[in-house]
Design a protein with these regions (language model features):
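Short, charge-rich amphipathic alpha-helices with coiled-coil/heptad character
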Residues: 1-5, 19-59, 85, 132-148
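Long amphipathic alpha-helical coiled-coil segments
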Residues: 67-79, 113-138, 184
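Short, non-ligating residues that shape and space the ligands of small metal-coordination modules
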Residues: 213-214, 239-240
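Coiled-coil termination/hinge junctions
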Residues: 145-206
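Amphipathic alpha-helical coiled-coil segments
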Residues: 53-65, 106-127, 173-174
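Short linker/helix segments within small regulatory modules
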Residues: 218-227
Length: 246
């Protein structure tokens, strides 16, 4: 294939644009801001899970406090009833002994329940404190997520803008290229990754492999408008303007 030297050099500009588009795509897929956002989101979710577990624990201990308070209240009412009977003077000696024994049992039961209630209330206080601290931590992490989200979105927007600029530049360059030369370039780019490279110091600018003397001689003997290919990577070899042709 033959193509004007200027056309061939346009391929180098196009290859530069395509390389930048590849870099932008890679950057978009590996954004540090995305990783920071993912980490912040994971931490927030873990904190929210811990907050949920503490909320359940707090509900459970509240229910236990309510149950114990009800039991203590029931024992006290029973004690009040027994004392009222004792004070009434209407019970016989057998009933009196039974009431006194029951009162002793009830007083012991009340003391035990109050001790248990005190322990549970202390546990409730501890869990409530942990819950409040965890809620504050979760809220702080939520704010971190929003900051990370904004940074991620700004970085993504910057990449999108840069990609749009490169796409526009590519459209401009391809509009000035011969259709057959562009098709050859695009076909190589799809199959080999890099469509064209500058021949410099005996090396292919696409694959960076040094060419042997025989290949260099063949290239030197070729006409300026001859479209050359790298024997290693098959990229289009573009010769420097100052050394093009014989």
């Amino acid at each position: 294939m033959k193509s004007d030297v200027a056309q061939q050099h346009l391929l180098l500009k196009l290859a530069g644009v395509d390389a930048e588009l590849v870099r932008l795509t890679h950057r978009a897929a590996h954004l540090p801001e995305q990783q920071a956002y993912d980490q912040a989101l994971a931490e927030e979710r873990a904190a929210t899970d811990r907050l949920g577990a503490l909320a359940v624990a707090l509900d459970d201990v509240e229910a236990e406090v309510t149950r114990l308070e009800a039991e203590v209240d029931a024992v006290r009412r029973r004690e009040d009833r027994d004392r009222s009977l004792l004070d009434s003077g209407t019970v016989n000696p057998k009933q009196l002994a039974e009431l006194q024994h029951e009162l002793t049992t009830l007083e012991r039961r009340q003391a035990d329940l109050e001790d248990i209630l005190l322990e549970v209330m202390e546990r409730r206080e501890q869990i409530a404190g942990d819950h409040a601290a965890q809620r504050a931590a979760a809220e702080a992490l939520g704010r971190d997520v929003e900051v990370a989200r904004q940074a991620r979105d700004e970085a993504s927007a910057g990449i999108d803008q840069a990609r749009a600029e490169q796409d526009a530049r590519r459209t401009e360059l391809t509009a000035g290229l011969d259709a057959d030369l562009l098709a050859l370039y695009d076909g190589q780019r799809v199959s080999g990754g890099i469509g064209a490279g500058l021949l410099q110091a005996g090396r292919c600018g696409a694959c960076r492999i040094e060419l042997d003397r025989g290949e260099i001689g063949r290239i030197a003997a070729a006409s300026d408008d001859e479209v050359l290919r790298c024997p290693e990577c098959r990229a289009i070899l573009v010769r420097p303007l100052k050394t093009a042709g014989r």
